[in-house]
Amino acid sequence: MKRMIPAALLALVLIAGGGWWLTTQLGGQTDIPAGALDAQESAEEVDTSSIVEMVQGDADAPITVVEYASYTCPHCANFHANQYKDLKAEYIDTGKVKFVFREVYFDRFGLWASMVARCGGQERFFGITDLIFKGQQTWVGSGQPGEVVGELRKIGRLAGLNDDQLESCLQDANKAQTLVAWYEENADADKITGTPSFVIDGEMHSNMSWADFKEILDEKLGDA
């Protein structure tokens, strides 16, 4: 199963707790300050070239797998707790697959998690991502923004980041806007409608068992 991206999802940037954050229009839970609306930019107006692709494996591997996932998606957490381990051991670590992880933002909590994961740079990104998915029920659980941020900071500190680093990353308004625009570009280009979704050598796949995933990879390796 995969989590569907709501059709009403729109990248709105708002001031909350001193930072600029992503929210959605669903249910109208959040009022958007006028200043934030004035500052909003469309994806076409934001230069996304500064966003680093998070990659594992051999850059010259015969197969490229791009995963689209949301940190608040239970199905994504399940994939990373199970099938991803097999994918990494059998295909990524053996040089058969170049794995690219791209974030999808259903809500502001997912954006905050992304900013914490990226705060550690390429070297720490996948380790922090693992911690975020493992602790998903804990940090998402309350649904209260202050508690969510507090739990994400705990994860960042567990990964070796200090409070100054975390504060700087979480308060980076330009980075938040750029990440949202980058996500929109990716989702539009690859026609992403839910998570987790996988683009395997340019072909979209979703709702797969590990056996199906493995069969696709082995077939492509046989053709390589």
Regions found by a protein language model. Give the residues of each.
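Conserved strand-loop elements at the edges of beta-sheets that form or border functional pockets
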Residues: 58, 67, 81, 207
